[in-house]
Swiss-Prot record:
HAMAP family hit by this protein: Ribosomal_uL13
Species in which this protein is naturally found: Helicobacter pylori (strain G27)
Gene: rplM
PANTHER family given in the database record: LARGE RIBOSOMAL SUBUNIT PROTEIN UL13M (PTHR11545:SF2), RIBOSOMAL PROTEIN L13 (PTHR11545)
Protein name: Large ribosomal subunit protein uL13
Superkingdom assignment: Bacteria
Family membership: Belongs to the universal ribosomal protein uL13 family.
Pfam families, per the entry: Ribosomal_L13 (PF00572)
Assembly, per entry: Part of the 50S ribosomal subunit.
PROSITE patterns reported for this sequence: RIBOSOMAL_L13
Gene Ontology CC annotation, any one: cytosolic large ribosomal subunit
Keywords: Ribonucleoprotein, Ribosomal protein
């Protein structure tokens, strides 16, 4: 018989991932799996059974190819002529937290459940974070 996860039975862990010298895309997929809860044996798609993920050294991540100069992110407020673009290099220097949230959000469900999952992601640009009391695991791999 298949066991499904109940909301009250889930015990969430805090996982700290160090992004220093890791490839961005591979790190993001690992984060998405942890947030979604797919690494657990009792994974249930309609229940949020993922862990809390703390990413440190967010701006020291590696990118392959020429993505830092070539990849652009666009924003549009809805007004004429308000399209703005930033390169990946600018995003990484100014707001690495937003960069991680954008990338992970694309890999999670586009529902209320996905919004609840993305709230469990904490990103910090250096190695100091305020979650030392909660963290139990370092580097899931």
């Amino acid at each position: 018989m298949t066991k499904t996860a109940k909301v009250n039975d889930i015990v969430r862990d805090w996982v700290v991932l160090d992004a220093k010298d890791k490839v961005f895309g591979r790190l993001i997929t690992e984060i998405a799996v942890l947030l979604r809860g797919k690494h657990r044996p009792f994974y249930t798609p309609n229940v949020d059974c993922g862990d809390f993920v703390v990413v440190i050294n967010a701006n020291k991540v590696k990118f392959s190819g020429m993505k830092l100069e070539d990849k652009e992110y666009f924003t549009h407020s809805g007004y004429f002529g308000s399209t703005k673009s930033k390169t990946l290099q600018e995003m990484l220097e100014k707001t690495p937290e937003k960069l991680y949230h954008l990338a992970v959000r694309g890999m999670l469900p586009k529902t209320k459940l996905g919004k609840a999952m993305i709230k469990k992601l904490k990103v910090y640009r250096d190695d100091k974070h305020p979650h030392t009391a909660q963290t139990s695991k370092k580097d899931a791999k």
